[in-house]
A protein has these predicted regions:
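ABC ATPase nucleotide-binding domain signature region
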Residues: 13-76
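ABC-family P-loop ATPase nucleotide-binding domains
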Residues: 50-146
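H-loop (His-switch) and adjacent beta-strand-loop-beta switch element
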Residues: 170-178
Length: 178
């Protein structure tokens, strides 16, 4: 299926852009192209600055490594201070002793908290967000929203969603993908 043909788009730095579209419109594929985790069949993608992996994405964590080991691994990939990121994620994700247990033993909520903590512990110029879903109890949701809003004071974001309301709340620009 062709997702974009002859497409040219500019996402300005420091701006939160929302992409709205129905299922199958190509929103997530476009995010993968921007992230560099997928290649276009023709043409090219030009990015400037540090672009995040999709915020909260836990799919690349190794199931047999602990939360701390996975965090250390990601820190090394991104050239971050490993000790600082581990301390940040341990405090932020509220995993207690589970942070030192294999990732495969985590509940879905624990996996999401670890992934979101790692995402927020790394500084990017642009954050990529594919269908934000709030995880955890009310206190964790509030803490997550606050830290994310803090990040957006110094960075931009590209959001994809089905939810018009969510995009209106978080974005300063937008487009509809057909």
């Amino acid at each position: 299926k062709t997702v974009a043909c002859g497409m040219n788009a500019v996402f300005p730095s420091g701006i939160s852009v929302g992409l709205l579209g129905r299922n199958g419109a190509g929103k997530s594929t476009l995010l993968k192209l921007i992230a560099g985790s997928a290649d276009p069949t023709s043409g090219h993608v030009i990015t400037n600055g540090r672009i995040s992996f999709p915020v909260g994405f836990a799919g690349s964590f190794h199931p047999d490594m602990t939360g701390a080991q996975n965090t250390r691994f990601v820190a090394r990939i991104y050239g971050a201070d490993t000790s600082a990121l581990i301390d940040y994620v341990a405090d932020f994700a509220d995993l207690d002793i589970h942070f030192h247990l294999p990732f495969r033993t985590y509940s879905a909520g624990m996996k999401s908290r670890l992934a979101f903590g790692v995402s927020m512990g790394l500084k990017f110029d642009t954050y990529l967000i594919d269908e934000i879903t709030a995880v955890g109890d009310a206190r964790f949701k509030q803490k997550s929203q606050q830290i994310f809003m803090d990040r957006l004071t110094t960075a931009g974001a590209v959001f994809v969603s089905h939810s018009n309301g969510m995009l209106r709340e978080l974005c300063t620009a937008g487009a509809v993908i057909e």
